[in-house]
Amino acid sequence: MDNLTSNHLKKIELSLPSEYYFDENFYIKELKKIWSKNWIYVCHVSRLKKKLSFLTLSIGKQNIIIVQNSEGKLKAYFNTCRHRGSILCEKETGVLKSKVFVCPYHQWSYSVDTGQLLKVASFSELPDGFKKDEVSLL
């Protein structure tokens, strides 16, 4: 092990070994050590010109939605309902018709402006101890 470089290669190479590109273990390490700890460029602001315009993308294994909220601010949220994990917005890009993301599965509703859970349509009464502020899209 003493003869390894800081990136674990035995010597300087023109290209990385193929397992660096195809091995699942390297991919998982990169997700944890690189992609989850740094800012990531997702798009130019010009792609979200109108209020309520959005785009969806994947970063690693996370499905993300970027939206210009009703106040004109850009927001990024997990594009996954906190109830049963359904994708909130299937389209790649577009303009929302309202200021609310509604899950197609059980109609949980989230604010486009804040990501906060607004309404739980599948329950007439919330269970004891259920805290809406703990199940936002953030």
Spans of model-derived segments:
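Rieske [2Fe-2S] iron-sulfur-binding domain
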Residues: 48-138
